[in-house]
Amino acid sequence: MQNQKIRIRLKAFDYRLIDQSAAEIVETAKRTGAIVKGPVPLPTRIQRFDVLRSPHVNKTSRDQFEIRTHQRLMDIVDPTDKTVDALMKLDLPAGVDVEIKLQ
Protein backbone atom coordinates (compact mmCIF):
# COMPACT_ATOMS: atom_id res chain seq x y z
CA MET A 1 0.00 0.00 0.00
CA GLN A 2 2.87 2.35 -0.71
CA ASN A 3 2.20 5.88 -1.99
CA GLN A 4 -1.40 5.69 -0.87
CA LYS A 5 -3.38 7.79 1.53
CA ILE A 6 -6.44 7.06 3.62
CA ARG A 7 -8.69 10.06 4.17
CA ILE A 8 -11.04 9.77 7.14
CA ARG A 9 -13.89 12.22 7.68
CA LEU A 10 -15.82 12.17 10.95
CA LYS A 11 -19.20 13.80 11.58
CA ALA A 12 -21.12 14.02 14.86
CA PHE A 13 -23.54 16.23 16.75
CA ASP A 14 -21.46 16.07 19.95
CA TYR A 15 -17.95 17.53 19.73
CA ARG A 16 -16.71 15.46 22.70
CA LEU A 17 -17.60 12.21 20.95
CA ILE A 18 -15.90 13.27 17.73
CA ASP A 19 -12.71 14.36 19.52
CA GLN A 20 -12.60 11.09 21.47
CA SER A 21 -13.06 9.06 18.26
CA ALA A 22 -10.41 11.08 16.44
CA ALA A 23 -7.91 10.50 19.26
CA GLU A 24 -8.66 6.76 19.15
CA ILE A 25 -8.07 6.62 15.38
CA VAL A 26 -4.81 8.59 15.66
CA GLU A 27 -3.53 6.34 18.45
CA THR A 28 -4.38 3.18 16.48
CA ALA A 29 -2.70 4.44 13.31
CA LYS A 30 0.46 5.57 15.11
CA ARG A 31 0.71 2.27 16.98
CA THR A 32 0.82 0.40 13.65
CA GLY A 33 3.55 2.65 12.23
CA ALA A 34 1.60 5.00 9.94
CA ILE A 35 1.98 8.77 9.69
CA VAL A 36 -1.15 10.72 10.66
CA LYS A 37 -1.96 14.27 9.59
CA GLY A 38 -4.76 15.82 11.56
CA PRO A 39 -7.37 15.80 12.95
CA VAL A 40 -8.26 19.04 11.20
CA PRO A 41 -11.48 20.67 12.44
CA LEU A 42 -13.73 21.56 9.52
CA PRO A 43 -16.41 24.28 9.77
CA THR A 44 -19.39 23.38 11.93
CA ARG A 45 -22.63 23.19 9.98
CA ILE A 46 -25.49 24.90 11.83
CA GLN A 47 -29.10 24.25 10.81
CA ARG A 48 -31.64 26.59 12.42
CA PHE A 49 -35.38 26.01 12.58
CA ASP A 50 -38.02 28.59 13.57
CA VAL A 51 -41.29 27.17 14.87
CA LEU A 52 -44.45 29.04 15.84
CA ARG A 53 -45.13 28.72 19.57
CA SER A 54 -48.86 29.16 19.26
CA PRO A 55 -51.08 26.88 17.15
CA HIS A 56 -53.39 29.74 16.15
CA VAL A 57 -52.24 33.38 16.53
CA ASN A 58 -49.15 35.36 17.61
CA LYS A 59 -46.97 34.96 14.55
CA THR A 60 -44.23 37.04 16.17
CA SER A 61 -43.80 34.54 19.01
CA ARG A 62 -41.46 31.76 17.84
CA ASP A 63 -39.13 29.11 19.19
CA GLN A 64 -35.72 28.65 17.62
CA PHE A 65 -33.94 25.30 17.45
CA GLU A 66 -30.60 24.42 15.94
CA ILE A 67 -28.60 21.33 15.04
CA ARG A 68 -24.81 21.63 15.00
CA THR A 69 -22.86 19.09 12.95
CA HIS A 70 -19.17 18.99 13.90
CA GLN A 71 -16.63 17.58 11.42
CA ARG A 72 -13.01 16.42 11.56
CA LEU A 73 -10.68 15.38 8.74
CA MET A 74 -7.54 13.25 8.97
CA ASP A 75 -5.12 11.73 6.51
CA ILE A 76 -3.14 8.55 7.12
CA VAL A 77 -0.08 8.62 4.87
CA ASP A 78 1.58 5.36 3.71
CA PRO A 79 -0.66 2.98 5.67
CA THR A 80 0.53 -0.57 6.22
CA ASP A 81 -1.64 -3.67 6.10
CA LYS A 82 -1.63 -3.69 9.90
CA THR A 83 -3.02 -0.15 9.89
CA VAL A 84 -5.95 -1.07 7.66
CA ASP A 85 -6.74 -4.17 9.73
CA ALA A 86 -6.58 -2.21 12.99
CA LEU A 87 -8.86 0.52 11.62
CA MET A 88 -11.39 -2.06 10.43
CA LYS A 89 -11.54 -3.64 13.89
CA LEU A 90 -11.85 -0.29 15.67
CA ASP A 91 -15.10 0.12 17.60
CA LEU A 92 -16.32 3.74 17.54
CA PRO A 93 -19.37 5.22 19.32
CA ALA A 94 -22.76 5.05 17.61
CA GLY A 95 -23.13 8.83 17.30
CA VAL A 96 -20.12 9.24 14.98
CA ASP A 97 -20.43 8.97 11.19
CA VAL A 98 -17.20 7.77 9.53
CA GLU A 99 -16.36 8.18 5.83
CA ILE A 100 -13.18 6.47 4.61
CA LYS A 101 -11.65 7.06 1.17
CA LEU A 102 -8.55 5.47 -0.32
CA GLN A 103 -6.54 7.82 -2.51
Curated annotation (Swiss-Prot):
The keyword ATP-binding does not apply. GO terms for molecular function: structural constituent of ribosome; tRNA binding. The keyword ATP-binding does not apply. Keywords: Ribonucleoprotein, Ribosomal protein. One of its GO terms (cellular component) is ribonucleoprotein complex. GO terms for biological process: translation. Belongs to the universal ribosomal protein uS10 family. Involved in the binding of tRNA to the ribosomes. Part of the 30S ribosomal subunit. NCBIfam families: PRK00596.1, rpsJ_bact. This is Small ribosomal subunit protein uS10. It comes from Ralstonia pickettii (strain 12J). The lineage of its organism: Bacteria, Pseudomonadati, Pseudomonadota, Betaproteobacteria, Burkholderiales. The gene is rpsJ.
